[in-house]
């Protein structure tokens, strides 16, 4: 019987990137429109990428098994 491959969750694959050290990087949302009511600090912080917390990283790695 053939071995079954795991499927990559395509929405997660578009939103997360695994770095060389194994951390999972993501880009913050909510800064593409309706920005006039947001403060400059909030918009500036939204431009920076961030890393997934360790307690959630294992669940994200299950969604992107071939990128880990």
From Swiss-Prot:
- One Pfam family cited in the UniProt record for this chain: Ribosomal_L35p
Is Phosphoprotein one of the keywords?
Answer: no
**InterPro entries assigned to the protein according to its UniProt record, in alphabetical order:** Ribosomal_bL35, Ribosomal_bL35-like, Ribosomal_bL35_sf
Q: Which GO terms describe its cellular component?
A: cytosolic large ribosomal subunit
Tell whether Ribonucleoprotein is among the UniProt keywords. Answer: yes
MF terms (GO), sorted A to Z: structural constituent of ribosome
GO BP of this protein: translation
Q: Which UniProt keywords apply?
A: Ribonucleoprotein, Ribosomal protein
Fetch the NCBIfam families from UniProt: rpmI_bact
Q: Which family does it belong to?
A: Belongs to the bacterial ribosomal protein bL35 family.
- The entry's protein name is Large ribosomal subunit protein bL35
Please name the source species: Persephonella marina (strain DSM 14350 / EX-H1)
């Amino acid at each position: 019987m053939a071995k079954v491959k795991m499927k990559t969750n395509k929405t997660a694959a578009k939103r997360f990137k695994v770095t060389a050290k194994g951390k999972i990087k993501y880009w913050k949302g909510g800064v593409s429109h309706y920005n006039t009511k947001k403060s400059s600090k909030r918009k500036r912080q939204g431009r920076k990428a961030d890393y997934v917390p360790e307690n959630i990283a294992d669940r994200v790695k299950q969604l992107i098994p071939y990128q880990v």
